[in-house]
Amino acid sequence: MNDTYATPLSQDAALVAALGATAMPFSRTAQAQAESWIRTLRLHGRVGSAMQALGIGEEQLRVEHDDPVPPPEGDVAERVVALAHELAEIDRSNSTNTYYLLLALLKIYGDVMDRALELHGASAKELLQRLDEMAEHAEAS
């Protein structure tokens, strides 16, 4: 992955990106890719903490069979990391962390990622609200 960005990947984000990249060739649909990202994200960084606080588990709470959506074209892991770096730079963040990976995933996968999160127990909106609450609490401490 390209390391020429002003904001380096945090350790958690680097791990999520690497694990996500290894899973993409085996995921034939956008839904399967979103599942892989969720399972990896929920274990790492601020996003993982927020997902666990919301009760987002490894397995889906219910299984629904939506029509398959083709995966994004190209090297999706590279696209996710590149967009995450751009978003972190716009925010003038010191690092590209799992929060920016999540924002990039939501942008690239759109409704597919939101639907996958809902099947695990929380919407993207709820997850972003929880992350905001965690950031506010950290600033107040």
Where do the protein language model's features map onto the residues?
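Histone-fold recognition with a strong bias for associated Lys/Arg-rich disordered tails
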Residues: 1-141
